[in-house]
Amino acid sequence: MTVQTLHHRFELANEANHPVITVNGCRICLDTGSPFTFKHPLGPDSLRIFGQESRLPEIPASRSQMEAGSEMLGFHFDVLLGMDVMAPLAWRLDWAAGTAEAAPTLPDEENTTWLPMPPSLGMAVSCPSCRVNEGQEVALFDTGAQLSYRIGTIPGTAREAGEAQDFNPQLGFFETTVWEDDLTIGGHTIPVRFGQLPRMGAVMLEAMGVSWLLGSDLLRAFRVTLDFPGRRLGLRPQEAS
């Protein structure tokens, strides 16, 4: 999909820790963890966004599974917008203000920390990555993840904080212990709540040397700029916005 070179603004909702915009009545979940854009089994066959209309493949999960997953997660979407559509643009997501912006370039803002954001796996449409904890660990940023996840050994500083259920179209339903800890990114220390992925989901990330899959924690803490064309991540603490 190609996009027109315009500055687009949307209302951004926090739907059960998922970023959702609405375009022409269509509820769209922004998901940097998905290489491709999909329709929900009950969603539209095509999507018009950024001046282009494209037919949408159906997400690789059954209707009953997706409906049960939506009920369990507490939110519903019509379209999962993946990196094939998001990657050509820079995005600025601000849950506190309820706004999302997308454009070929976005102006830099004061009080923003910029980090290199190379694409993981060396592919332009894969989940964006950055370094955390004084550069010692690699993290992927998945806006479609309601919970963050630790890949590998749980840090000794982490505190158990209960249990959680989660759902992923590829992994299905799963349960995890939830931990709480602090994470340092770009000189900022933020609290994170995280679980552990099922082995099938963790094995590839382990092979890539990934230690963290960061979900909604980043959007709660920062006004986030995902400058995909410039391959950089901008973090502006919410108290500075």
For each predicted feature, which ranges?
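Pepsin/retropepsin-fold aspartyl endopeptidases
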Residues: 1-241
